[in-house]
Amino acid sequence: MTLEQKPQNTLLKQFEDTRSRTLELVKTLEKDDFGVQTAYFTSPPKWHLGHVSWLNEIVLSKTQKNYEFYSEEFSKYLNSYYNQFGKPHDKAKRGLMSRPTVDQILEYYDLITKKVTDVLQKPLTPEASYLFTMSIHHECQHQELLVYDLQHLLGDQYRPVRLTNIEKPPSLEQESIKIPGGIYKMGYSGNGFCYDIELPEHKVHLDDFEIENFPVTNFQYLEFIEDGGYNDFSFWLSDGWDSVKKNEWSAPMYWEKDGDEWFTRDFVGKRKINPNEPVCHVSFYEAMAFCKWAGKRLPTEAEWEKAALWDDERNSKTIFPWGDEPPTKN
């Protein structure tokens, strides 16, 4: 793959925007919030801020001569699973560490932002441009992780800066869309950024298949619940049924029943389930059980990629399901 070199001002703008968005996500937190870990599968907010900065330091060390890391002790705590940089700290115990402190992490975040900004104002090699692009995408991933960790941590006590009124989705008529099979090219073959798991581009054979025109809705999933879906082992994989019993699952995470009505809790507070919204916060096991109950199945990775990205008119894939234009800030 030949690496594409991004224009200097484009990469710098992307980096600055990304760092600003991360800080925006934690802007309304109290200091006591930053170090709390509410479950083994979440991470404290301060860890996310430190980790994305630490990865930027990894990139700096690979692109700048004689680069010295800010702190070896920081590296031990902020490493996630990169064994070449030492033994990672146990994810389930990230919230047990009081050091580095919140103030130290915020100072570290600001320092690394300045260091990378200085570098991005100078000419870069294609390899360096690729690595800094990777670190930007990596931070965007952690923004997503940070949001769902904050929901688990604070629920409707969290006050996002950009929280807007939720638009009620329209009621759509469900239909199955027929997707023709044949040879389909998966993966990436361009000169821009991609993760290594997208390489190499390769051909796969798909049979004809059908896929619904919109994701499973709250209404559809509620039908599964009310039909005893969580009480009938025949819909569940063995490990899934064990999880149902062990964790006492009876509905998606954040759902609760009040009288005869179902509610969910999110950043706007407790509200009635909107029947037309896509169901969220279900596990793989729950998704599989629903599909078996509905007489359907989950799409394969290749099927979903073709259904979501293939454009018949131009005979090629789009970058996003809606086209090639990047998502807006909202």
Model-identified regions with their sequence ranges:
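Active-site-adjacent bridging/hinge elements
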Residues: 19-31, 86-90, 114-121, 260-267
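Short glycine/proline-rich turn/loop motifs
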Residues: 2-3, 89-99, 122-123, 199-205, ...
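N-terminal regions that are enriched for targeting/export leaders
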Residues: 2-34
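Short, contiguous alpha-helical
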Residues: 32-87, 121-169, 177, 213-218, ...
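A non-catalytic, amphipathic alpha-helix used as a structural packing/dimerization or gating element
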Residues: 13-24, 104-115, 141, 285, ...
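Generic, well-ordered alpha-helical scaffold segments in large soluble proteins
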Residues: 21, 25-28, 55-59, 115, ...
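Functional-site microenvironments in short loops/helix caps that host divalent-cation chemistry
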Residues: 135, 139-141, 145, 153-167, ...
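Acidic/histidine-rich alpha-helical segments that form the ligand environment
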Residues: 14, 80-126, 130-134, 212
